[in-house]
């Protein structure tokens, strides 16, 4: 969708964690839709400070509404470094080839609940910041999975609800460029929470999420024009 809003009023629901990716998607959505809502999930996550960050950003960015939904049942079912404070976040993959920060079923649940809520709100689209290019080995960040969920929601609710993934084919440097394109680089850099240890902005600098975030930012700042050109070629 182009940045020019359409003549027919449009609504979107953003799956919004308060992190870099979802905040960037939210910023873009505000320029593309007449009405933007946010939904944040509280699943007892290790970095649960992100919920307060999401609330603050939702107010600052003037969302039409922002819902925080209790999904702590997921914490009981899914054992992960993100749902158990006693499990240290590891840089090594588990025996199944996945990082120990993978939360089984998380995006299945989140997109299902977002679909139900979007139906209630009358939204045209759900927007989520999952990414296959820079994804951390999570199977529920793949485009194939997202398309499958979109088809299931449309069939199950008899409504052509789209799941839009603006970052799916962007690398992390291009995601930073997208925030800069909307003049919100500083906000995303200093006010979002990506860190698995719950530290706002630059984060702990050590967990996998922080390493990926900082590497992308360094790449963008050192090669801003070429990265922006690459981003624009994908939009």
From Swiss-Prot:
SUPFAM superfamilies for this protein: Adenine nucleotide alpha hydrolases-like (SSF52402)
Cofactor: Zn(2+)
EC number: 6.3.4.20
Top-rank lineage group of the source organism: Bacteria
UniProt keyword Nucleotide-binding present: yes
Listed GO MF terms: ATP binding; ligase activity, forming carbon-nitrogen bonds; zinc ion binding
Any Gene Ontology biological process: queuosine biosynthetic process
Binding site for Zn(2+): 195, 204, 207, 210
Main function: Catalyzes the ATP-dependent conversion of 7-carboxy-7-deazaguanine (CDG) to 7-cyano-7-deazaguanine (preQ(0)).
Name of the protein in its database record: 7-cyano-7-deazaguanine synthase
Annotated source species: Shewanella frigidimarina (strain NCIMB 400)
